[in-house]
């Protein structure tokens, strides 16, 4: 009995243009600014047998996991060579792997790379003071990365509560509820609080924006 063709179906995200913008940004952040120094960029001529793969960008993450953004080309050969592009975004851990959305990829990348709020900003948030820096990866905060006010509350909880019947305890209680109200207010709009000078490091606009991904 003759065996028929077998197809492997994977979820991909369409890319309207060519991949040069994505490749150039990755190489710039890897070799020039060093923000992505630990990232592995594999061009098409080093991929090997997977001739449909344009490139692979592998982001090592925390906890022995990594994120891989694999670019495909030649998806519609009947319309011309290299006529269509798409990317597959996959998260690998020790026990499982799964395909993720661009928003989830932004959160995973931000957990390891790029400058965010410093410890000093967290202390300012606890005291209710004006923040002096902002995040270099604001796109990632739309999904799973906690707001700064939430991080500040976590720090307060980890440090423990002051003793009873003390001025410090009353001040802590006042700052706690003030921070809680700020967190609830900011959580509705997913907006960052901060002012003019950014944190040190390169700005990253997000995976979907760089690739101009079409859903």
Curated annotation (Swiss-Prot):
- State the remark under miscellaneous: Required for replication in 'nonpermissive' cells, including primary T-cells, macrophages and certain T-cell lines, but is dispensable for replication in 'permissive' cell lines, such as 293T cells. In nonpermissive cells, Vif-defective viruses can produce virions, but they fail to complete reverse transcription and cannot successfully infect new cells. Vif-defective viruses show catastrophic failure in reverse transcription due to APOBEC-induced mutations that initiate a DNA base repair pathway and compromise the structural integrity of the ssDNA. In the absence of Vif, the virion is morphologically abnormal.
What is the similarity comment for this entry? Belongs to the primate lentivirus group Vif protein family.
List where in the cell it is found. Answer: Host cytoplasm; Host cell membrane; Virion
InterPro entries in the record, alphabetically? Vif (IPR000475)
For this chain the motif BC-box-like motif maps to 147-156
Q: What's the name of the protein?
A: Virion infectivity factor
Which source organism does the UniProt entry give? Human immunodeficiency virus type 2 subtype A (isolate KR) (HIV-2)
The keyword Magnesium is annotated on this UniProt entry: no
What role does this protein play?
A: Counteracts the innate antiviral activity of APOBEC3G. Forms a complex with host APOBEC3G thus preventing the entry of this lethally hypermutating enzyme into progeny virions. Functions as an adapter molecule, recruiting APOBEC3G to the ubiquitin-proteasome machinery. Targets APOBEC3G for degradation through the assembly with elongin BC complex, CUL5 and RBX1. Binds viral RNA and affects the stability of viral nucleoprotein core. May play a role in viral morphology.
- Give induction info: Expressed late during infection in a Rev-dependent manner.
The entry's free-text remark on domains says: The BC-like-box motif mediates the interaction with elongin BC complex. The HCCH motif (H-x(5)-C-x(18)-C-x(5)-H) mediates the interaction with CUL5.
User: Is Membrane found in the keyword set?
Assistant: yes
Query: Biological process GO annotation list?
Result: viral life cycle
Q: GO CC annotations? A: host cell cytoplasm; host cell plasma membrane; membrane; virion component
**What's the protein's topology in the membrane?**
Peripheral membrane protein
Which domain of life does the UniProt lineage start with?
Viruses
């Amino acid at each position: 009995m003759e065996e028929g063709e077998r197809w492997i179906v994977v979820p991909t995200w369409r890319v309207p243009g060519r991949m040069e913008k994505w490749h150039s940004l990755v190489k710039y952040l890897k070799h020039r600014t060093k923000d992505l120094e630990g990232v592995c960029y594999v061009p098409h001529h080093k991929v090997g047998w997977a001739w449909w793969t344009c490139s692979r960008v592998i982001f090592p993450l925390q906890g022995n996991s990594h994120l891989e953004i694999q670019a495909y080309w030649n998806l519609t050969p009947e319309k011309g060579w290299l006529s269509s592009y798409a990317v597959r975004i996959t998260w690998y851990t020790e026990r499982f792997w799964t395909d993720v959305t661009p928003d989830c990829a932004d959160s995973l990348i931000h957990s390891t790379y790029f400058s965010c709020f410093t410890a000093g900003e967290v202390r300012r948030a606890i005291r209710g003071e004006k923040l002096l820096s902002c995040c270099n990866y604001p796109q990632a905060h739309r999904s799973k990365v906690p707001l700064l006010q939430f991080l500040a509350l976590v720090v307060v909880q980890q440090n423990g509560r002051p003793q009873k019947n003390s001025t410090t305890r009353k001040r802590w209680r006042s700052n706690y509820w003030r921070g809680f109200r700020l967190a609830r207010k900011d959580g509705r709009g997913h907006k960052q609080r901060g002012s003019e000078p950014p944190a040190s490091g390169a700005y990253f606009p997000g995976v979907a924006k760089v690739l101009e991904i079409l859903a």
